[in-house]
Curated annotation (Swiss-Prot):
Keyword line: Iron
Protein name (database record): Probable Fe(2+)-trafficking protein
Gene3D superfamilies: Fe(II) trafficking protein YggX
Function: Could be a mediator in iron transactions between iron acquisition and iron-requiring processes, such as synthesis and/or repair of Fe-S clusters in biosynthetic enzymes.
Family, as annotated: Belongs to the Fe(2+)-trafficking protein family.
Length: 91
């Protein structure tokens, strides 16, 4: 049976993650408050961010930047700014 959470990103009830995907307190907060749909949206943004800024996950400063962007995106409603990216328009 699917686990539902009130997703703070979508601001509605939605299917929750199956297990904690991120370590520590932030991981618990994500597990308790973020839906599968919101996490999938973050993963797309994260991939674009890593590629555009050429982030190296072996570099602790790059990991901290990515974690801050994740927190801003999922919990504070701030979109990830990717220079030169123009989102497709809805039809």
């Amino acid at each position: 049976m699917a686990r539902n959470v009130f997703c703070t990103y979508l601001n509605q009830e939605a299917e929750g993650l199956d297990f904690q995907l991120y370590p520590g307190e932030l991981g618990k907060r994500i597990f308790d408050n973020i839906s599968k749909q919101a996490w999938a949206e973050w993963m797309k943004k994260q991939t674009m961010l890593v590629n555009e800024k050429k982030l190296n996950m072996m570099n602790s400063e790059h990991r901290q930047l990515l974690e801050q962007e994740m927190t801003n995106f999922l919990f504070e409603g701030k979109d990830v700014h990717i220079e030169g990216y123009v989102p497709p328009t809805e039809k």
